[in-house]
Structure formats: C-alpha cells, structure tokens
Amino acid sequence: MAQTTLKPIVLSILLINTPLLAQAHETEQSVDLETVSVVGKSRPRATSGLLHTSTASDKIISGDTLRQKAVNLGDALDGVPGIHASQYGGGASAPVIRGQTGRRIKVLNHHGETGDMADFSPDHAIMVDTALSQQVEILRGPVTLLYSSGNVAGLVDVADGKIPEKMPENGVSGELGLRLSSGNLEKLTSGGINIGLGKNFVLHTEGLYRKSGDYAVPRYRNLKRLPDSHADSQTGSIGLSWVGEKGFIGVAYSDRRDQYGLPAHSHEYDDCHADIIWQKSLINKRYLQLYPHLLTEEDIDYDNPGLSCGFHDDDNAHAHTHSGRPWIDLRNKRYELRAEWKQPFPGFEALRVHLNRNDYRHDEKAGDAVENFFNNQTQNARIELRHQPIGRLKGSWGVQYLQQKSSALSAISEAVKQPMLLDNKVQHYSFFGVEQANWDNFTLEGGVRVEKQKASIQYDKALIDRENYYNHPLPDLGAHRQTARSFALSGNWYFTPQHKLSLTASHQERLPSTQELYAHGKHVATNTFEVGNKHLNKERSNNIELALGYEGDRWQYNLALYRNRFGNYIYAQTLNDGRGPKSIEDDSEMKLVRYNQSGADFYGAEGEIYFKPTPRYRIGVSGDYVRGRLKNLPSLPGREDAYGNRPFIAQDDQNAPRVPAARLGFHLKASLTDRIDANLDYYRVFAQNKLARYETRTPGHHMLNLGANYRRNTRYGEWNWYVKADNLLNQSVYAHSSFLSDTPQMGRSFTGGVNVKF
C-alpha cells in the first residue's frame, strides 16, 4: 500500500515538539489512569454543556488513560461498565452501549458532528482521534438533548485541544507519545504542541502516525494472523485561537487518512441482484427500474423474494478471485470554528458558537481497483446561550442547523451493481434547551429538543417521464419530512456529601436515516441486501434509569438500573426465508432485508465497586448485563392461495440481534512506590445463548490484562513509561456484539510506550 503524502506532514508536526522539551518545568502532577465517575461535586467536569451537569452514571475517561488504549473508539471504551465494542478488523470499532449502537448513540467530536459514515456500516471508522484527545465523556440525561434526539443509551463526546481555549503556561505546552505492540505489530507516534504568540494568540499543531499489520489470533483455521486486519492511519491538525479575559475564538483544519483491511470480506454475491418487485410492477411502473426504493407494499413479491445470482466460484471467504485483497482507502478533511464568550449580552452569562464542515470520502478497493465509493459532506452550525439565574433556575438554550449530502455508489457499471444509496440530502433544524433548579442537596434538571428533518433524493424527472410509457401515475417524489420531539427529566439527590442518587426519565424520538428510507443494494459488511422503506415513521422510546454513586476515602461505587421501551423500533426484517425457491438454504447466506418497525424492550444493570484496604492498594469488581427483545413484530403476507387470497402470518417476539453477553470483572491497582504503579484487570465474558434469528452461540472467554507505569518529572517534562500485556492467557475472543462474531479478536499482545508532557 503506497504511503500517502500526509506522512511527512505528521512527522514534521511530531519533530517540531522535540527541541522544546528543554523549556518545560518540573511539576508534581500525577498521572490518573482510571475511569472517573462523576459523583462528587469536586470531580472532573464534562465540557459538553455550558451548565456542567451530570448524572451518577456519567463517565469521564482521562486522556492519560486513552494514550495507552486502542486508537479506535469502540476498543478504547470496551471494558467500561455497560460498554462493549463492535469490532471490524483493525480499522473500525464502534461502542455498543447498553445493547445499542449506531444511530441510537451520538458520537461527537468536541461537541460537534463527526461528519463520517460510521453509522452506515460497521466496517466504517469513526472520525475521532482518542489517542490525541483530552478526555472522552459518556453522558446521559437531559444534557444529551443539547446535541441530538434518540440518545437512549447515552452520548459520547471526544474532547480535544485542536482549538486552544486558554494561553499555555510559560508560553508553550505539549505532549509526545510513542508505543510499540506485538499483537498487531503496531508502531504509533503522536504529539501536539501549543505555542503562545504574543499576549492573546495561541498556535496549536498535532499529529498521529500509526502503522499496524494483521493481528495475531490463537487457534483459528491454522492461521497465525487474521488476514486483512491491518490498519494504517495518519492525522495532522493545525489551529489558531485568540484568547481574552472574556473568552476565545479559534479555527482549525484537520486532515486524516486511513487505509485498513476488511477481514472475512467475500465476493461470493458480487454477481447477484435482488428480486423483490413483481414483474408486472416493473413493467407498469418503469420508474422502479430506475429507483427501486420507490416500491410500495403492493409491489413486493412476497411469494418468492430473494437474490438472483450468476456463477461465481468462491468457496472460501479469504480466497479472493478478484484482483487483490479488500481494503478501505479513506480521507476526511475537517474545517472548524469554535468560540465561547462570557457576558455577551445583558441577561446572559455565556455564549457558545460551533461551526464545522467535513468532507469525507472512502473507497472500497480490491487491490488497486475501486469497487465502491462513499461520500459525505457535512455542514453543522450551533449557537448556545446560558441565561443569568432566574430565581433557582439556570438554563442553556440554543439552535442548530445540520446538512448532510451523502451517497454510496458502485464504480462498476454492471447491471447487478446496484448503488446502495443514491445522492441524497438531509437537513435538520433543531431547537433545544436545558433548565436546572438547585436546592441545598438536590438538583432537578429538564431538557427538551425539537428536531425537524427534510430528507430528499435528487431524481431525474425527465428520465422518469420518458420511461413512463403507460402513463402510470407517478409516486410522490417529494422530500420525506418529519419532526422529532424529545423530553428528559432528571433528579440528583446528594443525601450525604459523598452519595449521589440520580433518577432520569425521558421520551426520545429518532428520525429515520436516508439509509433506512432509500437504501437498495448489497451490504457485504452485514451480509445483507438492504431495501429501504420510505414509509417509516419516527422511532419512539420511553426510558428510565436509576443510578447510585458513592465516593469516600476508601470506598467508591457506581450502580445503575435502566429500561428502554421502544415503539416503531427500526430493524432489518429478513424476507427471503422460507418464502419460495429463492429462499436461503443456510443461515450464513446473504439475507434480503427490508427496514420495518416493531416494538422493542431493553433492560439491564451495570456497576462497579472499589475499595482501598491501604492508601497504596485499590481493589474492585465490575459487571454489566443487558437483555433485548423485539416485540409486536408486524405480520408478514403469506403466499397467495388458489383463490387469490393472501393471509397474513403473525411473527413471534424475538431476541434483539448482537446484544452483548453478561460480563464480570476484577481489578487491582497498586502504587508500589511514589513513581511506580501496577494494575491487573480480569474479565469473564459469558457465553451468549439468547440468540436472534440467524445468530449462532458465541462462546465465553477469560480476559487477563496486566500493566505497569513508571513516572518521573524532570526539567525536560513529565515522563510516563508504561508496559502492558493484553489477553495474557491468549484466549480465543469472540464478540457477540460484532457483525464478525465468528471471527476472533486479537490474541496475546505486549505493548511498551512512553508519553511526555511539557
């Protein structure tokens, strides 16, 4: 794979920092390598809202911890109670929170839209850089409505320093990192620097360069390493801010390029197309040949839906007959402006403005040949104002505009290469607000968000008219318009100075995506042929959470119970199962799915308890469990009888797909000296036997990780040397939450690295 021109840029950013290390001064700040629960009033605060509110189940993961974690967001957060990963090789991994993923979890890049297409497919990387971040915040409650609707499991905000918000001490500050890993042969360098320019300007540059090979796997098909699990990444960013006594305004430009393989990627169905529309409908409604997503219920051939395929010899998913191995070539350019100002107008305490634009593209390739390409252009603007207290009330209100233009097209002009998603445009207009009332030991908080969506496809109306030989009435080609209204209420009771009890209730509404509305094409990553449903309604959920947190001198615990009940839950309904000669004969075959809606019910528990028997030792246990069911599924039309009658067949309730198995953990951290820490983390992930249709049992596994850190402050900065061993038992690890649940994750791996702050 050819090196990109971004590599010299990244390396130059890292080298800029080296001569400046001598300017750093000694400090006594220790490195916190733990996940922080937001319980005590003096704990670190989230940066996501002007009110700095939190519930007892919120989490903050420090940047120091993230420097030693995987660079993909899902893998970096995996292990936090309630959070698992949906891994897809070495290049993509999304968080699975309380059994939810994708569009039911909002991921932000420092309060702004990520602008990627990670929600579209599990093999698409999320465009955030955890290895360069200041912290990652997992937030729940009313504050999530400041950013989007439908966040039933929470909001993940990756806070960074691309746009400086304060002047660096002594005129310069920064950080450098280097690490090597054996499991995936990873080599990673990262760094960033802030340079004061005069009294008010700050220049920031940062970069990351990562190169990794196929990762090691134990006992898998006589392979030592998983083919096509390699991943390379290069990121560079430059920002400039003006900082004054009342606030700041800054801009930044970031350029990220990824190249990573696609494991278990098969071309077996390349010569297939969907047969889902009645032949008579294709003749009478010729626009369906151009735009098959315009089909209605009466157009669907429920007697024999399925795939029609030409001959293609591919008995092994790893034995590609095409020109080369499958991989993704990705580039993301981000332009950003942030500003925050104190006392901007009479009656208001603070103003926050955030503008960002993303130009995202990736090509799916076989060797050097482009097979599919994905585009997403995002423009986002939001303004948030915090008003002065009105009695006990403090509040923050704002508006947001979001526009996305995206597509998923094929580069091959074959009839069977149906584009999965045509050029489309989505516009969101949102109004949001959060109000908070405080008493001595009790806080009541409410939030609201109203979100209007307009989703449209650009049709060639002249071509439709020309092909309409029989003057058949045309369907509505207008935009899909809907409005989501979400509300949340949370109470936080500090019944002692160390205790926090939070009760949160919400009604959330999520609008269907253009993929769910208009898709019509093969999706190899999920082994499906997707058919959109332009008649989808908004998804609704009623949610409740009870969380208890305690933080004392020796004990710390955080416990949470939750339930999410959905109406109009959007899911992919399989059509080619037992409905004619084209039906699948094996659960591993490609499914023909159409987006539909049903009820759903998710509930679970998560928690962690820590105890310090001595000032130098800390032991703890953790665990999580989630259960998900699809309920009240719509009846499917049966086969037409000899009299022309078509009965409807009721569908039984089902287990929700890809719900993580239960997990228990044991943790030990020891401060061996003032400079040396050691930690042990053991997890038991149980087998998942509660299976959705077409799923197979995922075996459980034991995970043992060890690590040690050595810290030293010198005149050259704060140094932190670390070593760690992951999956020390070399277990075969399979994740039920992944679309590749039968593909193992990385085996035993040893990592060594160093970070220095100055």
Curated annotation (Swiss-Prot):
It is a multi-pass membrane protein. Residues 50-161 form the TBDR plug domain. It comes from the Bacteria. A motif (TonB C-terminal box) lies at residues 741-758. GO terms for molecular function: metal ion binding; siderophore uptake transmembrane transporter activity. Coiled coil: none annotated. PROSITE patterns: TONB_DEPENDENT_REC_1 (PS00430), TONB_DEPENDENT_REC_3 (PS52016). Gene3D superfamilies: TonB-dependent receptor, beta-barrel domain, TonB-dependent receptor, plug domain. It is found in: Cell outer membrane. Residues 1-24 form the signal peptide. Pfam families: Plug (PF07715), TonB_dep_Rec_b-barrel (PF00593). One of its GO terms (cellular component) is cell outer membrane. Keywords: Cell outer membrane, Membrane, Receptor, Signal, TonB box, Transmembrane, Transmembrane beta strand, Transport. Residues 171-758 form the TBDR beta-barrel domain. Its main location: membrane. GO terms for biological process: siderophore transmembrane transport. SUPFAM superfamilies: Porins. InterPro entries: Plug_dom, Plug_dom_sf, TonB-dep_rcpt-like, TonB-dep_rcpt_b-brl, TonB_rcpt_b-brl_sf. Present in outer membrane vesicle formulations which are used as vaccines in human. Probable receptor, TonB-dependent. Belongs to the TonB-dependent receptor family. This is Probable TonB-dependent receptor NMB0964. It comes from Neisseria meningitidis serogroup B (strain ATCC BAA-335 / MC58).
